[in-house]
Swiss-Prot record:
Entry's Gene Ontology molecular function annotations: heme binding; iron ion binding; taxadiene 5-alpha-hydroxylase activity
Membrane topology (UniProt): Single-pass membrane protein
UniProt keyword annotations, A-Z: Heme, Iron, Membrane, Metal-binding, Monooxygenase, Oxidoreductase, Signal-anchor, Taxol biosynthesis, Transmembrane, Transmembrane helix
UniProt keyword Transport present: no
Reaction(s) catalysed (UniProt annotation): taxa-4(5),11(12)-diene + reduced [NADPH--hemoprotein reductase] + O2 = taxa-4(20),11-dien-5alpha-ol + oxidized [NADPH--hemoprotein reductase] + H2O + H(+)
Pathway: Alkaloid biosynthesis; taxol biosynthesis; taxa-4(20),11-dien-5alpha-ol from geranylgeranyl diphosphate: step 2/2
GO CC term (a single one): membrane
Enzyme class (EC, first level): oxidoreductase
Cofactor: heme
Similarity remark: Belongs to the cytochrome P450 family.
Name of the protein: Taxadiene 5-alpha hydroxylase
Domain of life of the organism encoding this protein: Eukaryota
Length: 499
């Protein structure tokens, strides 16, 4: 029955490319509508015999998608989930992006979804994300293929490997602050941290230092990201169409880089560990098989997306939150100056120094708790699942969300307050499956340590260069349109240089 459904949808996509005036289009569309109606009736009859979670599915194929997307863009997802939890409980059904979906709230629900990959559930992305990220990335691969892909990326993102890249990242951040921040009375934070985060990726992923080339790639990425949240309509004038074109252009550039790097590796003018591109090109699985070009292309698309969003959001929001919590900012300053006091003039930050930035990382964690860069992720049930007295049918989507734990006083005391100290002692007082800014389980973000390193080094160099700052508009709102949550106007600040 699922195969029939998929073939019907495929046929629909095919006939929608026909001239709408043709009689064949009308006949085909009527037939498809009839088949889909029969499928809905069949599924409805089967599901009526099951004890499904409470909730409402709404209009077929549409459900509550528009309400959900509106909440996403207005930064009111917490309210969306809270209203349904209050009405239906911690387990409820809805319909999102064309699929019946069960939302599991709280740490128990998070644990069920995140700890049962390929046992009860498997990763599920909306179709437009799959088209833009590709089917061969670490984010989309499943089972053994996913494990192999994570193994390939560990050669770059593992803590041992990251230590060798501190120097390059440190140099780029210091250069960026000297060029874009130092000597300025006022700056707008968001566009600057976006530029910095992307340029770091361009250098450490592809060894691209040329600013014009960095800008060109950055614009392509922005086009792809905006299209990720647009209606999946592949027609001129639509954001999704522009995103697909951007991905095609990105592929062309990447293929040229891959070809050149293969030649350089063979000649010895490039090393196997100089950047992520070299790491992926020289990786071999336990059978001695290298990654294909498509696998490398899709991973770069996925990683550029993930590393960009999950880092720019906390980097920008740290400024906003610390500006309204000056006592916390002073603790950050004290920690960073203490590290500097133990360094010789011109001596660079080391991995040991990063490990000593405990309070600074607590500030970043609290920022991620209050404004998680991801609201959660979807999975698909690969078997009927029994949970909390309900049946979640095979084929239905499941959604876990950070909004069911991050802002709740059941898990975090006075959650509305900015309290970095709640993460002291390595966060041992934080209950499992309640703090999930980078996901969890087998699919936790492979690059979270990379993101952590960027944030800590950036804060260090800012404190080293400036004694303080004040916001131009302390009450600037946070927007989630598009994801992730960000200052709606970029958050302008006045800078006061260190004497």
């Amino acid at each position: 029955m699922d195969a029939l459904y998929k073939s019907t949808v495929a046929k629909f996509n095919e006939v929608t490319q026909l001239d709408c005036s043709t009689e064949s289009f009308s006949i085909a569309l009527s037939a498809i509508a009839g088949i889909l109606l029969l499928l809905l009736l069949f599924r409805s009859k089967r599901h009526s015999s099951l004890k499904l979670p409470p909730g409402k599915l709404g209009i077929p194929f549409i459900g509550e998608s528009f309400i959900f997307l509106r909440a996403l863009r207005s930064n009111s997802l917490e309210q969306f989930f809270d209203e349904r939890v209050k009405k239906f409980g911690l387990v409820f059904k809805t319909s999102l992006i064309g699929h019946p979906t069960v939302v599991l709230c709280g740490p128990a629900g998070n644990r069920l979804i995140l700890s049962n990959e390929e046992k009860l559930v498997q990763m599920s992305w909306p179709a437009q994300f799959m088209k833009l990220m590709g089917e061969n990335s670490v984010a989309t691969r499943r089972g053994e293929d996913h494990i192999v892909m994570r193994s390939a990326l560990a050669g770059f993102f593992g803590p041992g490997a990251l230590q060798s890249y501190i120097g390059k990242m440190n140099t780029e951040i210091q250069s960026h602050i000297n060029e874009k921040w130092k000597g300025k009375d006022e700056v707008n934070v968001l566009p600057l941290v976006r530029e910095l985060v992307f340029n770091i990726s361009a250098i450490l992923f592809f060894n691209i230092y040329d600013k014009q080339e960095q800008d060109r790639l950055h614009k392509l990425l922005e086009t792809i990201l905006v299209g990720s949240f647009a209606l999946p309509i592949d027609l001129p004038g639509f954001g999704f169409h522009r995103a697909l074109q951007g991905r095609a252009k990105l592929n062309k550039i990447m293929l040229s880089l891959i070809k050149k790097r293969k030649e350089d590796l063979q000649s010895g003018s490039a090393t196997a560990t100089q950047d992520l591109l070299s790491v992926l090109l020289t990786f071999r699985d336990d059978k001695g098989t290298p990654l294909t070009n498509d696998e490398i292309l899709d991973n770069f698309s996925s990683l550029l997306h993930a590393s960009y969003d999950t880092t720019t959001s906390p980097m920008a929001l740290i400024f906003k939150l610390l500006s309204s919590n000056p006592e916390c900012y002073q603790k950050v300053v004290q920690e960073q100056l203490e590290i500097l006091s133990n360094k010789e003039e011109g001596e660079e930050i080391t991995w040991k120094d990063l490990k000593a930035m405990k309070y600074t990382w607590q500030v970043a964690q609290e920022t991620l708790r209050m404004f998680p860069p991801v609201f959660g992720t979807f999975r698909k049930a690969i078997t009927d699942i029994q949970y909390d007295g309900y049946t979640i049918p095979k084929g239905w989507k499941l959604l876990w969300t950070t909004y069911s734990t991050h802002p709740k006083d059941l898990y975090f005391n006075e959650p509305e307050k900015f309290m970095p100290s709640r993460f002291d002692q390595e966060g041992k007082h934080v209950a499992p499956y309640t703090f999930l800014p980078f996901g969890g389980g087998q699919r936790s973000c492979v690059g979270w340590e990379f993101s952590k390193m960027e944030i800590l080094l950036f804060v260090h160099h800012f404190v080293k260069t400036f004694s303080s700052y004040t916001p131009v508009d302390p009450d600037e709102k946070i927007s989630g349109d598009p994801l992730p949550p960000l200052p709606s106007k970029g958050f302008s600040i006045k800078l006061f240089p260190r004497p």
